[in-house]
A protein has these predicted regions:
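Alpha-helical linker/edge segments of TPR/alpha-solenoid repeat scaffolds
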Residues: 3, 69-75
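N-terminal acidic leader/helix
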Residues: 1-34, 62
């Protein structure tokens, strides 16, 4: 893979990690609002939706790390 392609891919991956974590933060904020208003069960249910975007952000980070190593190995 060419160096420029790797750098472009890393930039896109990092942007997507930001999107996924922003989504998780929005979900957490909604869950917090629920529990602050006494809807504990609803807050827990809402918070369960955090798992997928965090999982996806983690896998994207794995990909970015791999591409970073590939880029370093090209030097």
């Amino acid at each position: 893979m060419e160096r420029a392609s790797i750098e472009t891919a890393i930039k896109l991956i990092i942007a997507e990690i930001h999107n996924k974590l922003s989504e998780a933060a929005r979900i957490a904020k909604a869950a917090e609002a629920c529990v602050q208003n006494g809807a504990i069960a609803e807050g827990v249910e809402v918070a369960m939706d955090i798992e997928q975007p965090i999982y996806e952000a983690g896998r994207l980070q794995d990909a970015a790390s791999l591409l970073g190593r590939m880029k370093r190995d090209q030097n």
